Amino acid sequence: MTDLSDIRREYTQGGLRRADLPKNPMQLFELWMTQARDAQLSDPTAMCVATVDEHGQPFQRIVLLKRFDDSGFVFFTNLGSRKALQIAANNKVSLHFPWHPIERQVSILGEAQPLSTAEVLKYFMTRPKESQIAAWVSQQSSKLSARQVLEGKFFEMKAKFAKGDVPLPSFWGGYLVKPSSIEFWQGGEHRLHDRFLYTREAQAWQIDRLAP
């Protein structure tokens, strides 16, 4: 077994105090996202999306956040993917943003609701044409005999859609994750990290400090 117990660092970039917390967690998330972008983090919108299968086995993957507001967090995916099939059976998910360079994490629990076709199409039309074509090519999570199979299909579809717009695939969609709780974690000195949990209660949010 490889021993990694000596890998550690101190957290020095500041704390998080209750007096600084807004009543609405989405305001704090917006501030932290802005600061993550300003810090030029690699892929600040990358989040881990966790789902479970029918046996209770959890699965995680990195997905890009595409939009957020007071209603929740939006991402897009192939509707034949493992994540989409698992969401169809159990729409309870968790999201996690690991902003290690600025010593912050955000963890979200909620329910994923499918977006309307109009909402999906609006976003799909903003994607680069090659990305639109790629959505047609990949049967996400299916087994491939070789990468060349995928590349061959890509160039085939690229030729097919050389002229005009690329239509929205019927098997491509998106989700709005409506949060029931949002936890903000800020690294602290001596491992005395600051953790605050927002829990939705009716029309307001309960705020609790958690032990690190």
Swiss-Prot record:
Residues binding FMN, per UniProt: 61-66, 76-77, 82-83, 105, 140-141, 185, 195
Molecular-function GO terms, alphabetical: FMN binding; pyridoxamine phosphate oxidase activity
Keyword entries, A-Z: Flavoprotein, FMN, Oxidoreductase, Pyridoxine biosynthesis
InterPro entries: Pyridox_Oxase, Pyridox_Oxase_CS, Pyridox_Oxase_N, Pyridoxamine_oxidase_dimer_C, Split_barrel_FMN-bd
Enzyme Commission designation: 1.4.3.5
Broadest EC class assigned to this enzyme: oxidoreductase
Cofactor field: FMN
Residues binding substrate, per UniProt: 8-11, 66, 123, 127, 131, 191-193
Pathway involvement of the protein, from the record: Cofactor metabolism; pyridoxal 5'-phosphate salvage; pyridoxal 5'-phosphate from pyridoxamine 5'-phosphate: step 1/1; Cofactor metabolism; pyridoxal 5'-phosphate salvage; pyridoxal 5'-phosphate from pyridoxine 5'-phosphate: step 1/1
The reaction(s) this protein catalyses: pyridoxamine 5'-phosphate + O2 + H2O = pyridoxal 5'-phosphate + H2O2 + NH4(+); pyridoxine 5'-phosphate + O2 = pyridoxal 5'-phosphate + H2O2
Gene Ontology biological process terms from the UniProt entry: pyridoxal phosphate biosynthetic process; pyridoxine biosynthetic process
Cofactor binding annotation: Binds 1 FMN per subunit.
Pfam families: PNP_phzG_C, PNPOx_N
Source species, domain of life: Bacteria
Record keyword DNA damage present: no
Biological role: Catalyzes the oxidation of either pyridoxine 5'-phosphate (PNP) or pyridoxamine 5'-phosphate (PMP) into pyridoxal 5'-phosphate (PLP).
Recorded family membership: Belongs to the pyridoxamine 5'-phosphate oxidase family.
Protein name, as recorded: Pyridoxine/pyridoxamine 5'-phosphate oxidase
Gene name in the database record: pdxH
